[in-house]
Curated annotation (Swiss-Prot):
Biased composition (Basic and acidic residues): 119-138
InterPro entries in UniProt: DUF5330
Sorted UniProt keywords: Membrane, Transmembrane, Transmembrane helix
Protein name: Uncharacterized protein R01001
Entry keyword annotation includes Transmembrane helix: yes
Pfam family, one: DUF5330
Membrane-crossing residue ranges in chain numbering: 1-21
Length: 145
């Protein structure tokens, strides 16, 4: 879950910083809205603290949020696969334009590539959903002293 949040943050940061590298975009952005960097970071810091406080007060909200991010991650992965296949059909040369049903490198014979039912059961995880670590409270000073 945190990987998706971090990846979204860094991707957004890249999109924000790209116009600084292109001189023609600075002319377009001169007439756009202005912002203060310090105020923006302060607001982001307060938003993170607020969200952290919600997770401590109402853990069920964070649990649902984690489930939502997992579902969005699966959708994003499927979307990336669809985009890859589309780009592969548009820009690949020759016979490579047809998407492969199964990628084969030639190191495994087709008979060996079919997994047995027993091997599949051993390879599957024992849990069905991704475990999410809970927020730990600070131990604070010991009251028994």
């Amino acid at each position: 879950m945190w990987f998706l949040v971090k990846a979204t943050f860094w991707f957004s940061l890249v999109l924000v910083l790209l116009p600084f590298l292109d001189p023609s975009s600075s002319e377009k952005l001169e007439h756009g809205p202005k912002m203060e960097i310090g105020g923006t970071f302060s607001a982001a810091n307060e938003a993170i603290q607020y969200i952290s406080a919600i997770c401590v007060e109402k853990p069920d909200v964070c649990e649902k949020g984690a489930e939502t991010f997992v579902a969005l991650g699966h959708r994003a992965r499927e979307g990336a696969r669809i985009a890859y296949e589309f780009l592969n059909t548009q820009f690949a040369e020759g016979d490579a334009a047809a998407p492969d049903v199964k990628v084969m490198t030639g190191t495994v014979t087709p008979a060996e590539s079919v997994p047995s039912a027993e091997a599949t059961e051993k390879a599957e995880p024992a849990f069905k959903r991704m475990p999410v670590p809970e927020h730990r409270l600070d131990p604070g000073p010991a009251s028994g002293k």
